[in-house]
């Protein structure tokens, strides 16, 4: 009798695991397929906007008009004030985000890049993915827990399609919402979603991001103290960036209650700043600047600070886009500058800076390690891991996302349950 019970229990478990595999494999493929398609279109749209802006410098002077258009689109779609924080909240609660957020952020980000606002694309990808997943969750009438998992699938899928880092995308979507509480059951559906989205994006011609790090130094005491200096200073810069992003948004809302006026004024300020600095390097995402550091070792010491200013004004005024590419820009330029000061190659310093800045502003050390491997390869991975963990500790509870929940203290196992600031 006891053996029969064990056999029956084993059979039930096998069936449950097979059913979960088929169910979440199918849902992951579905969300990843659609997310990959939309994400690839989004990446191509941003690339087109960037090329058009480069070929037509006069487009910058239409930035205030673009701001008005973005506010109008968001009001038309009834998603004003909805962003990445609301997507995170949807993972933790029964609140979803409107499917109309996807076309709104798609169009808003494209306009921002076309006309010269300083923004990225990966934060927008998280919103598109969350919006698509919410739609499928309602369509299939999934329960609350399954909708949470599907939202993470959507986020990981579109992120992987846009940036070309499926491993980091899988873990980031799980890790970023509630730091310290890692939903391991979401790993399988998220990797199915991110891998399938990544594969489809490749087929559609979206090239993954990758940087060649030459002259990686030996792992010794002489190198390590230099890496630690870069990591700690990048952690401080990550706190400055988070503060600037939140303060910029609060200041614009305080000074200009009307959203249309806020966006128009922000556009004018970005135009004036661009004319003042005499370069277009800080408009758009800035991937070309990052590439030059790795390929030519060219870096300007003030670049990281100017990118913080441009991005905080752009996003604070109501323009749309992500914060991740600006984060990589700030990390690469600051890391490259510091590397020259301590006797390391700019490319190696840029890799260390990117890892430290990304971890400092997102509080996602595991995703940062995977991102470093996918972006730079394995040779510099140990240095990037150490830099990321040092920055994670020194950056405190600052975060780009006020909706991010930090479950545990960074100093002990004490449960604190605070939100990023």
Give the residues covered by each predicted segment.
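Alpha-helical transmembrane segments and immediately membrane-proximal extracytoplasmic
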Residues: 1-421
């Amino acid at each position: 009798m006891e053996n029969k019970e064990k056999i029956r229990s084993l059979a039930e478990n096998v069936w449950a695991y097979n059913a979960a595999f088929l169910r979440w494999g199918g849902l992951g493929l579905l969300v990843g397929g659609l997310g990959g398609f939309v994400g690839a279109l989004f990446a191509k749209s941003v690339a087109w906007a960037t090329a058009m802006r480069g070929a037509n410098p006069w487009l910058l002077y239409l930035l205030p008009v673009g701001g008005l258009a973005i506010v109008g689109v968001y009001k038309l779609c009834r998603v004003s004030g909805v962003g990445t924080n609301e997507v995170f909240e949807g993972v933790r609660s029964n609140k979803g985000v409107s499917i109309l957020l996807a076309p709104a952020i798609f169009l808003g980000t494209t306009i921002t890049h076309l006309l010269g606002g300083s923004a990225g694309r990966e934060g927008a990808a998280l919103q598109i993915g969350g919006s698509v997943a919410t739609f499928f969750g309602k369509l299939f009438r999934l329960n609350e827990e399954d909708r949470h998992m599907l939202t993470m699938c959507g986020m990981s899928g579109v992120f992987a399609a846009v940036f070309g880092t499926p491993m980091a995308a899988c873990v980031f979507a799980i890790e970023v919402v509630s730091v310290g509480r890692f939903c391991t059951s979401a790993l399988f559906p998220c990797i199915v979603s991110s891998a399938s989205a990544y594969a489809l994006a490749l087929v559609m011609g979206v090239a993954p991001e990758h940087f060649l790090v030459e002259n990686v130094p030996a792992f010794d005491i002489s190198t390590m103290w230099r890496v630690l200096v870069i990591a700690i200073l990048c952690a401080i810069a990550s706190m400055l960036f988070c503060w600037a992003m939140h303060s910029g948004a609060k200041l614009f809302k305080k000074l200009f209650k009307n959203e249309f006026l806020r966006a128009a004024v922000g556009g004018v300020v970005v135009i004036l700043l661009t004319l003042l600095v005499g370069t277009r390097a800080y408009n758009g995402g800035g991937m070309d600047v990052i590439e030059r550091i790795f390929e030519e070792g060219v870096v300007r010491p003030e670049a990281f600070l100017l990118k913080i200013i441009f991005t905080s004004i752009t996003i604070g005024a109501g323009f749309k886009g992500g914060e991740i590419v600006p984060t990589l820009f700030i990390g690469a330029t600051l890391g490259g500058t510091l590397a020259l000061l301590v006797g390391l190659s700019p490319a190696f310093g840029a890799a260390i800076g990117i890892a430290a800045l990304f971890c400092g502003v997102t509080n996602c050390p595991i995703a940062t390690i995977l991102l470093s491997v996918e972006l730079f390869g394995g040779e510099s991975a140990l240095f990037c891991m150490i830099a990321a963990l040092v920055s994670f500790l020194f950056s405190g509870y600052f975060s780009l996302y006020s909706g991010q929940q930090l479950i545990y203290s960074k100093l002990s196992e004490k449960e604190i349950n605070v939100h990023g600031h």
